[in-house]
């Protein structure tokens, strides 16, 4: 399925389109923890592609005011890829226009399991009481505690599932499914997705009156 893998052009267009739309935070599922089950050739392609795109795109991200934030696990991640991600984070650290969350070697269940493990360790060490654990406690132990809750989750390629992506952060996300493969999803398609999202009524589990006037004023798209 190499033909369905991303291209640098598609990545550039979507990031640029998000900046133009005023999106404050964009999360990209670059490589999942489940992707290690792919063939060695596919893994090499995805790792190499991510490294190449980061190296080539960092200057553009700096110019656009985009700050890179890596989200994921360290084990098994190629050292050269991790080095490139850290480099992009350092170079773009002062940018404030938009945050680009690079979800690399990431899995939603893995994130929650890692958070639970860290919390259990604090309880065992006597630094935290089990009765004091709240949703805020869990959030503080996620890979990127300051990440915004997701407003809009876009899935390309004709699949209608979220594939273990940002399970905690996307609890109340609006879903948008596109039949187009990722390489063909550009800024125009992004605009259409955001336009569809803008026409929806979000309730966050409550009645309309309960959330009237309390909708988020900043967008987070994945």
Q: Which positions does each model-derived feature cover?
A:
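Flexible, compositionally biased loop and terminal segments
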Residues: 4-222
